[in-house]
Amino acid sequence: MGKVRLLVQRRGRGSPTFRSPTHRAAGKVKIPTFDGDLVKGKVVALIKDSIHYAPLMVVKWENGAQSLLPAPLGISVGDTVYYGKEAPNAIGSIKPLSEIPEGTKIYMLENNPGDGGKLVRASGDFALLVQKLGDKVIVQLPSGQFKTLSANARAVIGVIAGGGRKEKPFVKAGNKYYWASSRNRHWPVVNGVKKNASDHPFGGKRHSNHSKPFTVSKWAPPGRKVGYIGARKTGRGK
């Protein structure tokens, strides 16, 4: 019989067990690109899938296109959203950063103009437009970090809905199990000392304490590299 590989070895192989199930997504969530300074759209649906933490809004534009975007707080089905330089400064409007007033809460920021929005996409998140400096704009991200972006990069005005998601506890292990299964998360996480000797270097019941030191060389083979890898020191600092 073959040896049972460690969890870190199995995860590193990248089997479907550990991959994000992107095929369960409702669609591609990105800022669309249209010609013209003002394009109107209508929110036709609010949906939720197992991939994105934030609720999504389905927008039907007047040119016939349809897009999927994180829903801002306060939006509802039937509301009108706008796209372009001449769009009003209303919730859900998509505008270049150069056309958005300073101090506005925004989300779905483009890291590079035209990339569709790569920053600030999680539920409850928003960034602040702090200052405009010619062709550059300074924004404050949810982490507190200040980032300089191109003034031609686009963003959506508002705060992403679903900010209280973490306030509701799982309560039962079954709820946590189904949540983890929907995202291919490995759960529950078991301590190596509690495992069998064949499953982990620290496992087994022959000794009351672990039979190997927690510190391990960074040159150790993959099946042994668990614990404090290449640690210079352990424990509390004096």
UniProtKB/Swiss-Prot annotation:
Entry keywords, A to Z: Ribonucleoprotein, Ribosomal protein, RNA-binding, rRNA-binding
Q: Which Pfam families match?
A: Ribosomal_L2, Ribosomal_L2_C
Q: Which domain of life is it from?
A: Archaea
What's a GO biological-process term for it?
Answer: cytoplasmic translation
Q: Which Gene3D superfamilies match?
A: 2.30.30.30, Nucleic acid-binding proteins (2.40.50.140), Ribosomal protein L2, domain 3 (4.10.950.10)
The ranges of region (Disordered) come to 197-219
Q: Which pairs of Cys residues are joined through disulfide bonds in the record?
A: none
- Please provide one cellular component term from the Gene Ontology annotations of this protein: cytosolic large ribosomal subunit
GO terms, molecular function: rRNA binding; structural constituent of ribosome
PANTHER family reported for this sequence: LARGE RIBOSOMAL SUBUNIT PROTEIN UL2, RIBOSOMAL PROTEIN L2
Assembly and interaction partners: Part of the 50S ribosomal subunit. Forms a bridge to the 30S subunit in the 70S ribosome.
Please give the function described in this protein's UniProt entry.
One of the primary rRNA binding proteins. Required for association of the 30S and 50S subunits to form the 70S ribosome, for tRNA binding and peptide bond formation. It has been suggested to have peptidyltransferase activity; this is somewhat controversial. Makes several contacts with the 16S rRNA in the 70S ribosome.
Its family? Answer: Belongs to the universal ribosomal protein uL2 family.
For this entry, the protein name equals: Large ribosomal subunit protein uL2
Q: Give the originating organism.
A: Nanoarchaeum equitans (strain Kin4-M)
